[in-house]
Amino acid sequence: MMAAASDSCLSLWEGSASSPNRQLTPEAVNCLTEALTEDVAVLRLIRSDPRVKIFMAVSVLTPRLARFAPPPPKLTHTAKCAVIMIYLTRPKALALQPKQFHMLVTFNKASVYSLVVRVKTKPFPVGTQRFRAVFQDPEFIGLPSDIPDPAAENIPTEINDRLDVSNFATPAQPPKDKYDCCVLAPGVWWSNANKAIYFLQMDVALLALCPAGWKARGLGIILGRLLNHQEGCATCRFTEHSDPLNATADSVATPESCLCWAPCLWRKAHQRELTVEGDRYLFRVLFMDAVERVRLTGLRRSPKITANLADLVVGIGPHGQQIPVNNAGWKLVALDADISRLIVCGCYALRYICPPTNSKHQPSSPDEYA
């Protein structure tokens, strides 16, 4: 059995800390369901039977989620994650309406909250037994006498689904509010208005000019491979990721899975003119001739979402001459809101840059969620 939420969350409660009848404040109830809707990308179904549905989710902490998670015992990269278990039941004694459920939510196996809530779900576009969920009309209800123990569940450990963002990118034009964005990496933007990621993507035919087995086609990733120093460092590897798709706090991230990958010296030192130190032959997918240096432009000041590679990079040859870019080999693409949220919820860097929305989730169509 598990204790209720720890003392670190007392500000969430009405009444005395020691009272058996204490309740979540109405603001906290709404904050919790908004966090589970907007700050969690995907739920992985762990168990489904006539009595209960159990889901698991992992997400990088946001201010909303952090209010409900217990303080970590050690400050590790996994301490920046929320590991969430959701138990949905329909006890007859509660006389619930259609789509209403009694929901127990546990955070990091230490804090537990009890609500009655309306739940709408739809299959997630990646993997099986994955769902996107919207939680609405929450009401506080006291904890039941029998609280499940997450450690007793048979949690799948296999990593059987991987995200390749190229498979979900669709051709796009710069949005109407192309300046309302923030730069995630060279040629990668977060659209504040659309809550979605746009990026410049290499044409698939140019993969033939890349190293054997190479799959990544985002501009920032290609630039990282071209420019990063070969001995590597923590910034080059950029290992701080979780895996929301497979609901694990640790991730073996690859360039195909996250668009945060970028030139190391640009990320950690804000350098804009970088010497080619990596895979020199990759210049062929970016420029019309060999380059010694690459200048990154239009990134930090007044950024805009653009389909023009020449707006973002300048190639400099061995004699200081400018080398034209291979503009025809690159197109602007966009990810939908669900895939964008999945990437952000698994990346500590992007979660810091991309603020979670404060608005209530509205399905794009009445039939979007069951």
Swiss-Prot record:
Keyword Phosphoprotein found: no
Major location (coarse): virion
Entry annotated with the keyword Transport: no
GO cellular component, one term: viral tegument
Coiled coil: none
Superkingdom, natural source: Viruses
Keywords: Host cytoplasm, Host nucleus, Late protein, Virion, Virion tegument
Subcellular location per the Swiss-Prot or TrEMBL entry: Virion tegument; Host cytoplasm; Host nucleus
InterPro entries assigned: Herpes_UL16/UL94
Assembly behavior: Interacts with cytoplasmic envelopment protein 3 and with the capsid.
Role according to the record: Plays a critical role in cytoplasmic virus egress. Participates in the final step of tegumentation and envelope acquisition within the host cytoplasm by directly interacting with the capsid. Upon virion binding to target cell, a signaling cascade is triggered to disrupt the interaction with the capsid, thereby preparing capsid uncoating.
Family of the protein in this entry: Belongs to the herpesviridae cytoplasmic envelopment protein 2 family.
Name under which the protein is recorded: Cytoplasmic envelopment protein 2
